Amino acid sequence: MLDILRFVLICGILWILRRVLLRVFIHSPLDKIPGPPPVSFAKGNLPQLYDRNGWDFIKGLGEKYGGVVKINGLYGAKMLFVFDPAALSSVVVKDQYVYERSEDATKSTRLMLGDGLLTSQGETHRKQRKLMNPVFSINHMRDMMPIFYQISRNLRDAIASRIDNGEKEIDVLDWMARTALELVGQAGLGYSFDPLVQDKADAYAEAIKALVPTAFGLRLYRPLLPIALKIGTPAIRRRILKLIPSTRLQRMREISDAIDAHSKRIFEEKKQALARGDEAVLKQVGAGKDILSRLMQANMTASEEDRLPENELLGQMSTFIFAGMDTTSGALAHTLQLLAEHPDVQDKMRAEIVAALGGGQEIPYDTLVDLPYLDAVCRETLRLYAPVTTVNRTAQEDIVLPLSEPIRGTDGNLIQEIPVPKGTEVIVGILASNRNPALWGPDAAEWKPERWLEPLPDTINTARVPGVYSHLMTFLGGGRACIGFKFSQLEMKVVLAVLLSSFKFSLSSKEIVWNVAGIQYPTVGASGKPEMPMKIDRVKNT
């Protein structure tokens, strides 16, 4: 077994050496694209881009170089950082099937999450979305409102029981993460992960929370994955994996195993309930209205051509949990922090919510989604603090990238379009696009919910940013736009409506730092632990 491990290591070194030599000695069309110097040849600019304070680096790219910038990847790789609107349209809409996820990114995600939307490509991806689009429809969102409200009330009661004696400091991120998991569990999978009663979160929730930071720490090894997956059988590869003395790698294996085991158990229970008939389905969590039940029922009646195999249905489960937990919980936590920083906005938003409740417990779907100030606060938070800051795509063939505005090359000439060689990694600058002052104006870096209560700048409307949501790249666009973005919006609005009608949120004395790398998450000061303490008190009736 050790001989196989040495063989894998030698193959990896030779593969890296070959790629390095090709990059050093072969001329690239990207050589004339301006960009910052690398930190080092081995790491390029990636330490700056993925630093916890990476926004300063991203902001500098736009100010100095424009909407398309050449940055340096691992071992001399030439990459493009893109937030020019025309270039974005090409990458995520017009030429979306040329710009796919890289082989190593796809395979590493598949190992963690299975064969879901995040790992499928081409015809398989189109087939999966075709079957899944109806279960994310507005009509289905209406059906899930009782689930959303019940879980949000459970959260409210849990917080209320902890502040009986007055204002108390509570880790808001932890509670938002637990709530997001329970929402995606019940509404997405028809399964309850966490009743929101105990102070300690569910062990499965803890594993999911650790997934992104753990995987992010292994990103430098990802290019070796395609080679490693060609060696032996899965059983042999697993034995080799257990021999590698890496705490982070072994933690990643444990997390992946936990996700897989939990998903299979839920799936089997759901299959058995569907086989027993309607009465058994109604007795399950969610009463058969959850996304997975609807998806499995649709799959059973689909044509042979459109039907998904079980491994792809299982993959959707892991994808729901992964995509729906960290992103939404982070967005909710950030919104509450911003409301604490702007108490006048919090008061105005609370007044709107209380008026809409009219003394009742729930705001109907149509009324809730149309509350103007609540909607403005959510949109502005998702604009300025998009949970996912960048996504990566790789050109599967040679292609030309159009530009809205020309950039000046390193030779002094204006560049109107960029030839992109096959294999080039393109980084979609989600946060950079959302904060682009050329589109949003000089106050683009300010949190101003009121901007959504008046007409947006003409520069926004004419730019045609290809995002599926409000001229923003937060949920991407095209065939790979976030399929659950309406689910996420509804989740945010219901939770905020329930919490703000009962509680007042204030800032902790502790310094909160938002880490930009990958998925944004808060920490206290220089700590690496995701958390966000806030002071919470009951709303005083007047």
UniProtKB/Swiss-Prot annotation:
This protein's record includes keyword NAD: no
Source taxon at top rank: Eukaryota
InterPro entries: Cyt_P450 (IPR001128), Cyt_P450_E_grp-I (IPR002401), Cyt_P450_sf (IPR036396), Cytochrome_P450_monoxygenase (IPR050121)
Keywords from the named record: Glycoprotein, Heme, Iron, Metal-binding, Monooxygenase, Oxidoreductase, Signal
Enzyme Commission number(s) of this protein: 1.-.-.-
Signal peptide limits: 1-22
Glycan attachment sites: 299, 392
Binding residues for heme: 482
Pathway info: Secondary metabolite biosynthesis
Cofactor(s) the protein requires to work: heme
Record has Cell membrane as a keyword: no
Enzyme class: oxidoreductase
A molecular function GO annotation: heme binding
Family to which the UniProt record says this protein belongs: Belongs to the cytochrome P450 family.
Function: Cytochrome P450 monooxygenase that is able to use dehydroabietic acid as a substrate for oxidation.
Name of this protein: Cytochrome P450 monooxygenase 91
Gene source species: Postia placenta (strain ATCC 44394 / Madison 698-R)
Taxonomic lineage of the native organism: Eukaryota, Fungi, Dikarya, Basidiomycota, Agaricomycotina
